[in-house]
Amino acid sequence: MAAAKKAVLGPLVGAVDQGTSSTRFLVFNSKTAELLSHHQVEIKQEFPREGWVEQDPKEILQSVYECIEKTCEKLGQLNIDISNIKAIGVSNQRETTVVWDKLTGEPLYNAVVWLDLRTQSTVEKLSKRIPGNNNFVKSKTGLPLSTYFSAVKLRWLLDNVKKVQEAVEENRALFGTIDSWLIWSLTGGINGGVHCTDVTNASRTMLFNIHSLEWDKELCEFFGIPMEILPNVRSSSEIYGLMKISHSLKAGALEGVPISGCLGDQSAALVGQMCFQDGQAKNTYGTGCFLLCNTGHKCVFSEHGLLTTVAYKLGRDKPVYYALEGSVAIAGAVIRWLRDNLGIIKSSEEIEKLAKEVGTSYGCYFVPAFSGLYAPYWEPSARGIICGLTQFTNKCHIAFAALEAVCFQTREILDAMNRDCGIPLSHLQVDGGMTSNKILMQLQADILYIPVVKPSMPETTALGAAMAAGAAEGVGVWSLEPEDLSAVTMERFEPQINAEESEIRYSTWKKAVMKSIGWVTTQSPESGDPSIFCSLPLGFFIVSSMVMLIGARYISGIP
């Protein structure tokens, strides 16, 4: 019996979407933007000390191989020929820092994740050396001096990890964000791997001049970073190298396919949402929450706690676009915390059911400042609090308050963005894994008091990476001309409460935020010493701990 003929669907484009919580590989039809198949693998996070967050770079790389292999198998089962995959794009969690040995291909330390707080004392020491405080760094990079960005993570590795120090001295060390590590590995690694990054990821290191689009010598000297370990900076859409056979990839799947698109995850989502015009904005709900507004070819510097960053540069000879960004550290991560740390839910999907049971937080407010507060406060001394508890409060109210917290944080970012841009958004385009939660989307519309618009195909981050890869010179299978872009169907959520109620809830939230600030001294994450305990009387600490224990047992329904 003759084998079934493989389906011909026109040129296909793959996308690696490597996030904080998971890795995925997705394949799209370049003519219709239809998602044909994908595979996902969850990624572990390690917390070796209070405030430290790490991941294993080899586990991340292996997850990419697994996702590519499984997706190709699924395409085969659908009778789709994988030889039609003409390009691959990469989207990645930004700022997360990796240093590896270019001779062995081995990471020299775990990846230090963007959420990590260990560098707070490093930040404080550096800030005292800056003339005019943060303006020296911000004027060049668009970023405040913060634990969030790669430069201080790399400085910590150079100061504290002997393997890194030795590799730098012996000219064996390479630095990169996750995109650099993946592209180097996928294009051959120790056998000619390409050491590069794109402008969007480079702009999150605090070492990159967003005006000249080059590594900044003054910044590298200030942070004490040797420039020879930095990757080459390329545009977001060009051929970086070709996929090479790996022992981890069966039968050399996708051997020779160009890797030709690369964007940090939030820039990729901006492209995937087709926010190509000045003033268009999107909000992505993932581990964190990130609101980006395209400001065109102009750098707009915020007066209200937002970041200025590179949005994209879709080709070597194409112009650069910039964005204003509001970053929230904890969004989907709070759901994971309720599941893994408190056991209030057994799966992430369960939170919608719990919240729906009560339809209100009953005056309970949750500020999930587990890693301090990012935009618009940039306050590392903040810590998470749950307040407004009564004897009536149960786990359903806590679940509802957690969802509200994501929405309130987005409201704070949007308010800051409206003040900076001067033109309030008439609606908010959203994407990311959490947007499948309809209660969250309705809450967001209520709290913003504007419509929330969600694309029917939620994989906009991967789509953006695929678009950049397919549009690259030398690939040319995906047109980014406005008339050629596929129309996207949308689901719309309208506000269902009045403006007065929305404002009352928001103002109460802001009171809760103020209570979370100044909770800890900022030396503890680096030393591993929870110094806040030292500042509390012992009796108060014991009594408050007992109250929290009893409250947690009550909320969980334990007798």
Curated annotation (Swiss-Prot):
It is an enzyme of class 2 (transferase). It comes from the Eukaryota. ATP binds at residues 20-22, 287, 332, 433. It is found in: Mitochondrion outer membrane; Nucleus; Cytoplasm, Cytosol. It is a single-pass membrane protein. InterPro entries: ATPase_NBD, Carb_kinase_FGGY, Carb_kinase_FGGY_CS, FGGY_C, FGGY_N, GK1-3_metazoan-type, Glycerol_kin. Sn-glycerol 3-phosphate binds at residues 20, 94-95, 148, 265. Pathway: Polyol metabolism; glycerol degradation via glycerol kinase pathway; sn-glycerol 3-phosphate from glycerol: step 1/1. Its EC number is 2.7.1.30. This is Glycerol kinase. The lineage of its organism: Eukaryota, Metazoa, Chordata, Craniata, Vertebrata.
